[in-house]
Amino acid sequence: MENAAVNSNMTNRETEAKGLNTEINPLFSILDKSEEFRRLQEGLCGCKGPAGVFGLGEAQRTHIEAALFSKAKRPMLVVVPSEQAAARVHEELCCYYPDAVLFPARELPLNAHSYVQSQELTSKRLRTAARLIKGEPCLVVAPIEAVMQRMAPPSVISAFTQTVRTGMVIEPASLLKKFIDAGYSREEMCEGRGQVCLRGGCIDIFPITAENPVRIEFFDDEIDTMREFDPLNQRSTENTDCVEILPATELPLDRDMRQKGIAALRSKAHYAAETEILRAGGIPQNALSLLPLFVRNEITLLDYLPEDALIILDE
């Protein structure tokens, strides 16, 4: 961790990291014999402030980062200079922890009124945000650009996350509205992430973080069955009893946020189209570029981390 700074506020955490190896990695036991590593670990555990480690190659840095994560068993963020470095470090850390996650930077808007972001990128960012909101001790790699970008507050993401179970009583139209409010696009057929459709007595939805869409079948107002299905041939593959469905956008809008946006854009003639979309209950394509109008607080990825998280600047 050349010029690396590690900031921590150590507390005990009994929860095991998702994907964390329960057996001691032999490569970590090698570090246990190092006096320098022991001092680094003791400094972090003793809350003695930032620590610096110098003169290491990239493979050595990721080795130490993985070892620190294995000791801490709490969220750890590794910040790197660029997207290319993030992809490289993430790949190396996955050799130790296959469940390490990459938090990419949001794509830049084409112009003031156009904003295009791939569903895959949105999926990665929301999946990481959801794990941090739950308090999972996950290992996150992010370029500095991603760390500095504004985000919606964790409470907004949580508010628009739906946990759907068999036996749940809810009107199909009401559940469909919840999905649309969370940023899902209503289509005639559900074929890609972020889409939802109502077909007879069932709702098909392709969760933004899922590999396959889900068919929710109703008996009157009760969810009778839920089945994953192949988006290509629309055939069911396997049953499921519970599905967590994250919002399909990083900026789902509740009523108050929507009204704030309308009020802020009302006097701006060149945003008339966005204002009309908001009034109609939709989410403008360029909503993320207008995020400060909807969210007043300066929220970034750092606000998703608990106070005792480890933050490593890998330069």
In which residue ranges do the predicted regions lie?
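ASCE RecA-like P-loop NTPase motor cores
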Residues: M1-E315
